[in-house]
């Protein structure tokens, strides 16, 4: 499961069809996230352009080697901070997965926060389905 978290393909799968991410810089997504900044174009429901965002990937170190962490400390012209920390830990034959998100968007923060709540609820449903199916992406094409 942790290997899946490292892939843009998983982001695409769990965000769809609510949000789509198209790479701008670099022009293609890597197979696995490397630390760095990835500019993307966002579309709501795959059709309505809602701007661009920087996905800023790091892999924070933790004292407990059993805990995996991936941070997207992203931002956009309207959202000064979209700090998303994923932690995952193998526990009793399963995986304990957590999302933590901090958002700052000035006067737009309440609206962005509401959208984020809806988006992460959607992601969690999609995650659960994928995990239950052994991360079988079906006919979706790799990014």
Please give the residue ranges for each predicted region.
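Hydrophobic ligand-binding cavity/cleft-lining segments
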Residues: 1-35
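Short amphipathic beta-strand and strand-loop transition segments with alternating hydrophobic
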Residues: 21-31, 58-60, 85-89
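A generic structural micro-feature
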Residues: 32, 47-49, 76-80
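Short beta-strand segments that buttress and anchor functional surface loops
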Residues: 36-45, 69-76
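Surface-exposed, charged secondary-structure patches
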Residues: 41-44, 54, 59
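Short, surface-exposed coil-to-beta transition loops
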Residues: 50-56, 80-85
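Beta-strand/loop substructures that line and gate deep hydrophobic ligand-binding cavities in soluble
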Residues: 70-117
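A conserved amphipathic terminal alpha-helix motif
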Residues: 102-143
């Amino acid at each position: 499961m942790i290997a899946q978290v490292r892939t843009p393909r998983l982001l695409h799968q769990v965000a769809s069809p609510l949000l789509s991410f198209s790479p701008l810089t670099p022009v293609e997504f890597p197979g696995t996230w490397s630390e760095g900044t990835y500019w993307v174009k966002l579309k709501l429901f795959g059709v309505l352009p809602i701007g661009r965002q920087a996905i800023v990937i790091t892999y924070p170190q933790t004292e407990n080697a059993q805990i995996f962490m991936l941070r997207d400390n992203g931002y956009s012209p309207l959202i000064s901070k979209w700090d998303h920390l994923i932690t995952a830990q193998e526990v009793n034959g399963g995986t304990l997965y957590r999302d933590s998100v901090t958002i700052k968007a000035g006067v737009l923060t309440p609206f962005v926060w509401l959208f984020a709540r809806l988006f992460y609820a959607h992601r969690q449903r999609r995650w659960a389905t994928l995990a239950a199916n052994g991360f079988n992406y079906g006919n979706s094409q790799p990014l």
